[in-house]
A protein has these predicted regions:
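Conserved, structured core segments of small domains
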Residues: 1-266
Length: 266
């Protein structure tokens, strides 16, 4: 089974202690076990951009999609035997101690080709050719009704342009599991990380020229009309880095937006 791990503030966020960040150890363990497909840290919530189409107009707003401004700070895609193993893997990630890790299974399609994976084999070794964004494909009860919900033409176009690197539909939020570690104990609860009426239905990982192109790609997705899309740039870092020094170096970037201000486009 393939699972998406999303790292969020959760309901009981703890102060981040870079001296206690064991991400290098976690990464080495998942690689050695052969369960890791790919993962990225993401820019802070201020750099998220929400895109939706209403009445033919592309509406672009800064920030995450929820009123509470909850955001996804990073993700990993893993393949393991079952949910219990996925929870065990998530519980060892440093985010489980400082915040929360959501475990959500990907859809399994009966007509999928044998050996199909969300992340293509060899992808992590490919060089970066542009700016990368995680795009959250979200359901919005206030979205437009009617219209085509066939995403395949969009997938074929974006794959052909080389801007969509991979993506897949997720199981519904009822199948989400929250994992936290507090006081050395693993705390597991059911449901998604946010109680907002909008919910994450799938993901796509994009590589584009800039935010303007990312918005254009997102707006072309059928779910931009029925729902909304959230674009957050990847924030790569070296897991072997001195995390205390990295946190000091990156501190000035927190709490402010580094992505361009866009407003409304048509």
């Amino acid at each position: 089974m393939e699972y998406l791990l999303m790292y969020t503030a959760g309901k009981d966020p703890q102060p981040y202690d870079p001296s206690d960040d064991n991400i290098a150890e976690w990464s080495a363990d998942t690689q050695a076990r052969g369960v890791s497909e790919y993962g990225e840290r993401l820019r802070p919530g201020e750099d998220a951009t929400t895109v939706k189409v209403r009445n033919g107009q592309v509406l672009v707003t800064e920030g995450p999609f929820t009123e509470a401004k909850e955001w996804v700070g990073g993700f990993d895609i893993i393949e393991c035997d079952n949910l219990d193993e996925a929870i065990e893997i998530a519980s060892k990630h440093p985010a489980a101690r400082f915040s929360s890790a959501e475990v959500r299974p990907f859809m399994v399609w009966p007509d999928a080709e044998p050996g199909h994976r969300v992340v293509p084999h060899g992808f992590p070794e490919q060089p970066t050719g542009g700016k990368r964004y995680l795009m959250l494909v979200c359901v919005d009860p206030n979205g437009e009704e009617g219209g085509s919900d066939d995403v395949e033409p969009w997938v074929q176009e974006m794959d052909g342009r080389g801007v969509r690197l991979f993506g897949e539909v997720l199981r519904p939020p009822e199948d989400a599991t929250q994992v936290m570690v507090r006081g050395g104990s693993v705390i597991v609860s059911d449901g998604p990380f946010t109680e907002a009426k909008q919910w994450i239905a799938g993901i796509d990982f994009l590589e584009v020229r800039d935010l303007e192109e990312a918005v254009e790609v997102a707006a072309a997705h059928p779910m931009a009309r029925a729902g909304l899309m959230v674009l957050t740039p990847a924030w790569p870092f070296d897991v072997e880095d001195d995390h205390v020094e990295r946190a000091r170096r990156e501190a000035p970037e927190l709490g402010r937006r580094s992505e361009p201000a866009l407003g409304v486009a048509s």
